[in-house]
């Protein structure tokens, strides 16, 4: 473990930032400063047009503003952040903030500003001589020129809750059907590596679909633009069950992450004879919220606010829940999916995740003799770990596995690491 935050580390990080392409792209046009405080000491890194200038010691902290970002933490928290192998939540400035161990102020309203601050934190580690947490980008062998992927995409028309949906899905492989669900505000591209993994497709017919309003599944309805998008439990379950029936899937295995992980448990509760097993990645009986008027009002406020900010912000804010050891290309691709979401979609998905999904008190009604339940949760999604553990304890016959080196988006942030955990589970079904 290295020492705590010091002036020489900040000066070193500023020099690295001045030559860092990622930091420069994210700070273009930023006239202001990044201020760092450790206990009673504080320093200012001036930025002119996004380029760092000489570090200045401070005698008092300035008021936080969008152009003056202030990062404060106790010496012990900085020591954890600057350790060789930081444990959750200290692998990321914003992860530590979510856990109440650091403070980054003000609340940042654009993804580039958020990512620039995150990047400066990682450059502090490099200035301390620590090995980068993220492995260097290595070229993928990929496909030969002119060669197609295995996955093939199609559109299918489905009637769900009295509405005709034109739903997009991709599939590859043959065998036991494996139905894959994406996270909030993303789409089936998150599963692209699984669709090409012949360790899986040699035994499973892998199908990944886009929810309406996501990816290539357009909104349904005659005047959808005049309607509030809200993902309810009934609609989410209806789409999965109706798609399985339309494709004539014989008791598929369902796997989903985040909202898909929550949906997995709803399907195990209400559709036990449709699915032979569900694999809940980052799933639980409930999120941190419950079904309440206050919760619904919070979702509506967030939806309105989201229209005023960078649509990439939700993904940037969740970067701290990804594994710091995941390939940088996977982390960046995960955030790209979010950046391409329409305003209001993330908030509409959160309604299901944080409000409408609620199975507390119903775990005993899930019959794992009819539909097996497997919970797998990444260690860097630290808030979900105890929630997933509780679900496994309360659902008779369910199992829980903590996935080391993974976060909230296992299938897109680090497919190979996910396979270390998913392949043994899938082996039970094919």
PLM segments and residue spans:
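Flexible "cap/lid" loop of the alpha/beta hydrolase fold
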Residues: 265, 269-270, 274-308
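Conserved alpha/beta-hydrolase "acid-adjacent" motif
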Residues: 382-387
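Active-site loop/oxyanion-hole signature of alpha/beta-hydrolase fold enzymes
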Residues: 162, 208-255, 420
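Catalytic active-site module of serine/aspartate enzymes centered on a nucleophile-bearing elbow/loop
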Residues: 398-430
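Conserved alpha/beta-hydrolase catalytic His-Asp/Glu region
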Residues: 289-294, 308-367
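Feature captures hydrophobic
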Residues: 1-146
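Short beta-strand/loop motif that positions the catalytic acidic residue
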Residues: 369, 375-377
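Conserved HGGG/HGGXW glycine-rich cap/lid loop of the alpha/beta-hydrolase fold
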Residues: 161-223
């Amino acid at each position: 473990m290295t020492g705590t935050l010091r002036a020489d580390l900040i000066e070193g990080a500023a020099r690295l930032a001045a030559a860092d392409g990622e930091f420069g792209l994210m700070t273009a046009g930023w006239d202001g400063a990044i201020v760092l405080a450790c206990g009673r000491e504080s320093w200012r890194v001036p930025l002119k047009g996004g380029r760092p200038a000489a570090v200045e010691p401070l005698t008092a902290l300035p008021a936080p503003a969008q152009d003056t970002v202030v990062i404060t933490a106790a010496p012990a928290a900085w020591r954890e952040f600057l350790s060789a192998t930081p444990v959750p939540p200290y692998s990321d400035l914003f992860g530590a903030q979510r856990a109440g161990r650091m403070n980054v102020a003000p609340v940042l309203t654009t993804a580039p500003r958020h990512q620039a601050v995150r990047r400066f934190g990682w450059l502090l580690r490099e200035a301390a001589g620590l090995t980068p947490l993220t492995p260097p980008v290595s070229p993928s062998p990929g496909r030969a020129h002119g060669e197609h992927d295995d996955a093939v995409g199609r559109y299918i028309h489905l009637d769900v809750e009295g509405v005709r949906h034109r739903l997009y899905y991709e599939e590859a492989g043959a065998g036991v059907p494996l139905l894959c669900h994406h996270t909030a505000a993303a789409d089936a591209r998150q599963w692209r590596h699984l669709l090409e993994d012949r360790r899986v497709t040699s035994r499973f017919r892998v199908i990944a679909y886009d929810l309406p309003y996501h990816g290539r599944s357009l909104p349904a309805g005659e005047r959808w633009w005049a309607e509030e998008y809200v993902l309810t439990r009934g609609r989410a379950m209806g789409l999965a069950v109706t798609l399985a029936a339309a494709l004539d899937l014989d008791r598929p295995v369902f796997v989903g992450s985040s909202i898909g992980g929550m949906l997995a448990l709803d399907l195990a509760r209400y559709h036990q004879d449709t699915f032979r097993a569900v694999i809940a990645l980052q799933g639980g009986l409930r999120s941190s919220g419950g079904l309440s008027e206050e919760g619904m009002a919070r979702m509506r406020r967030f939806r309105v606010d989201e229209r005023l900010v960078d649509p990439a912000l939700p993904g940037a804010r969740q970067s701290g829940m990804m594994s710091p050891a995941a390939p940088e290309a996977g982390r960046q691709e995960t955030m790209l999916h979010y950046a391409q979401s329409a305003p209001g979609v993330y908030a509409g998905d959160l309604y299901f995740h944080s409000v409408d999904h609620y199975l507390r008190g119903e775990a005993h009604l899930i019959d794992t003799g009819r539909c097996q339940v497997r919970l797998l949760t990444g260690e860097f999604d630290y808030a979900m770990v105890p929630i997933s553990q509780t679900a496994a304890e309360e659902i008779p016959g369910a199992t829980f596995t903590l996935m080391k080196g993974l976060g909230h988006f296992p299938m897109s942030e680090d497919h190979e690491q996910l396979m270390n955990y998913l392949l043994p589970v899938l082996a039970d079904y094919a």
